[in-house]
A protein has these predicted regions:
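Short histidine/acidic/glycine/proline-rich micro-motifs that form metal-
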Residues: 20-23, 106-111, 137-142
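Helix-loop-strand module that forms the ligand-binding subsite of alpha/beta enzymes
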Residues: 53-130
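Glycine/serine-rich loop-strand microenvironments at binding/catalytic pocket rims
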Residues: 1-17, 53-67, 153, 157
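N-terminal beta1-alpha1 ligand-phosphate binding loop
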Residues: 2-40
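A structural signal for isolated positions on well-ordered beta-strands in alpha/beta enzyme cores
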Residues: 13-15, 47-49, 103
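Residues at alpha-helix caps and immediate loop-helix transition turns in enzyme cores, especially N-
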Residues: 28, 81, 115, 145-148
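A short beta-strand-loop structural module common to alpha/beta enzyme folds
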Residues: 43-55
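Glycine-rich phosphate/pyrophosphate-binding loop and the adjoining helix
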Residues: 2-4, 41, 57, 129-174
Length: 174
């Protein structure tokens, strides 16, 4: 008898790494997850994995195909927890996921510019492709920010569903 095994089908994996230190960030995270798990994307079979920034590691990054990152702004910078995540994964994962799509959401009480710039710089160094503009919220998180977070999660997941190289925003390559 011939043993016919079907080739293993690999499901695209979206890793959501977050530091959710406030109700505002919880609302943003929940909206991102709802977007990433949108019923229209469900048929693509994308696996959405969620990891707190202090628990996520290089193994998680190496197993993922795309990323959503969430952080509060602390003293004008990303949270120490997200920075710790990057410190842990940077060298083991450097260049391992070229072109992997990613998105970012940030919440602060005043200016989010420094945190956004820092995360973008590190993600660019990792070789990841920003496929949607960062969602930034200052002060209370309203319905508009939640909708933007939903769209962010759906956009990154849709890039994985397309099964082609991600296209960086603002470019025509890819």
């Amino acid at each position: 008898m011939i043993n016919r095994t079907s080739p293993e089908v690999r499901v695209p994996r979206l890793l959501v790494v977050h530091h959710t230190a406030s109700p505002a960030l919880r609302a943003m995270l929940e909206a991102v997850l709802a977007g990433a798990r949108d019923p229209e994307l469900a048929e693509s079979g994308i696996s959405v994995e969620v990891a707190p920034a202090l628990a996520a590691n290089a193994t998680d990054v190496l197993a993922a195909d795309g990323f959503v990152l969430g952080t509060p702004v602390n003293i004008g910078y990303m949270s120490g927890a997200l920075k710790h995540f990057f410190d842990q994964v940077y060298y083991p994962c450097l260049g391992a996921k070229p072109g992997a799509p990613y998105g970012l959401y940030v919440h602060g009480d005043n200016n989010t510019t420094g945190a956004v710039r820092a995360v973008q710089s590190i993600a660019t160094g990792m070789g990841w492709a920003e496929v949607v503009k960062p969602v930034t919220a200052v002060g209370p998180v309203g319905k508009d920010a939640e909708r933007q977070c939903y769209d962010l999660g759906a956009t990154v997941a849709a890039n994985l569903a397309l099964d082609r190289p991600a296209r960086r925003i603002g470019t025509t390559d890819g």
